[in-house]
Amino acid sequence: MNRGLVYFHFDPHHQVRDYVLAALSSLRPHADHVLLVSNSPIGDADRARLETCCDEILQRPNEGLDVGAYRAGLEHLGWERLADFDELILTNHTYYAPLHPWEEVLTRAAGWEGISFWGMTEHAAMRPHPFLARRELPRHLQSHWIAVRHRLLADPAFREYWERMPAVSSYRDSIQWHESRFTGHFAELGHTWQVAFPVDRYRSANPAIEEAPALLVDGCPLLKRRALFHDPLHQDRQAVVGGELLEAAVEAGYSEDLILSDVVHTATARDLIVNAGLTEVVTGCVPGAVGAGVQTSSPAQRSSGCVVVHIPAGREAVERAEADGLARRLASLPAHWRVVVTSPEPLDAADLERVTGRRPTQEDTEEDSAHGEGDVSLRVVRDLDPRGTIAFLTQCDDLWDPGRGAGGDEGGDDGGDGDALVLRITVGPEPGPKTRADDVAHRQALDCLLDSPGYTAGLIDLFAQHPGLGVAVPAAGHIGQAHAGPTWDGLAGAAKALSRRLGLTVELDPLAPVAPSGAMFMARPAALRTLSEGAKELVRLTEQAAVGPEQSAERLKRARAAEVLELLTVYAAMSSGFHPREVLTAAWAGRLYGALAYKHRVVTADLPDHTDEQVRFLQARFGPRAGVGARVRTYVDVHHPDMGSALKPAYRYLTGGASDLARAATSAGRRLRDVGRPRGEDKGD
């Protein structure tokens, strides 16, 4: 069979991700001609990689989304040449593959004689249409894989379909004018079709997103990327269990790193953690032994590590460290890990031992003491914030990331047995007034990082098991804490501004950031480098604008710069290609779940049944767009769903028409306003 393949590619950051190469390389043996059409720029290095599995690469402007790319690819091949193919596959970058051999589905499809086209998956009919003023979204093949046979390629109607395609400028346009239209359009012209994995086998309208594990069990070779960054509330409504999809992909033999190193650039942190099941209840194990749970190598054979403990100025900070049992907790770490204490003021040997449980030498108590394996050392840093975050990123990176200074790609001196790790621990006081809830949150964070030798060994092994894991943060607590509105604490604007300044490629969570509680976490040094460089630039610019060190420190404190950097810790790691995980002990998992389940039941007792309905119900009454119309819509949807479904097409038609009229009136008004205006007059006056 003479088979061609047109692969649409787009990446907002102008990268060709490894999963794209994996998919194309696996398809190369099954296609006589591979054309990649990219709506985003391709660098020389990526082009060289693509040339190993593509015959042609067509780069074009980002116009028309996938529809524009397919049309450009067909025109590039030539309409007359299309008839030379027995089959032409139109496919794209929206999936990971192969999770099963292509041969299985291609061999099965080869037996479908007499058809004009076939698809990999399909979407069921939906009534009413989910977003248009129509009664129904028709059943249709999904556009991420449509294989067109010679019979349709040679039909002039195929060319006419593409050349008369309406302008496509949005995801909904693509669904309306191509994906949901292609199947029915050509079926009405007498062409027959097949689907490899019919929707009738499954219990949802969109199994590619809502039942992806079931598709994999049935042998589907591809996994839709959207399943990992789709709205978690939608997935919850469809009973999609976060984590099962990633587990199913790994069980099928696909690389977890290929998936997570890509999706971190698309999903927000919270969506990714929920959809991929990245909240870990760490199982303890015996260090240096193989237990029933996590298998652990000898501590002497582990990658090297460094723990940086920040002690604020004042005697009460040392006393707080003792009250936290910090010395006992630090004993949970492998003995060869280095312990570095940072503080704005010198600490004597007795204080260092009280805090760390390790006996320092006279040299270790100097303001910038040398350090070797297994010792405790002191570094006196500038007092720029209560938790020493800025100092950790700007004055201590040579301690936790020695590889960067040597020009290495990865930090540490691990002898090739994995990256070095850094553990960051802070001691109160926290910014602002203290409450019992703050004490609980601080204790929970310490437990989730330094609960016991077995637990901490399991946490270290988590990084060995997942090479793409960049930062592990204590799971978010909620006991005794307020949950009023977005939890960026007034720093959302500053976080967005600094994110742009740092060149972060990920989208910040709109409501609640994924941030390390108490600025405590375990991480790979490489995952912190972007944040460290950004903090250094921030300090440098502040010092240039200030009269002296005291004024620059005051400006950083007034701008809450350290808090913003803490909020961006996870997002900076994701922008570097690392994924985050939330970690907690089994004891805290039980405590938090029990309290949260009770809160959920009490809060939702008088709300609609499902969480997505509850959110819409509350937003209609208390959200930024609350109003009578929103209340009526949610009331009808909840109490009279059949009536709501019947009225939606008419409602969309009327509101859509009103919007069109409003836009037309505005445009006409502007034209009338300009009548008689002298040429060259400023229209902004």
Which residues fall in each region the model found?
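ER/Golgi luminal nucleotide-sugar-dependent glycosyltransferases, focusing on the catalytic module
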Residues: M1-G408, G416-D685
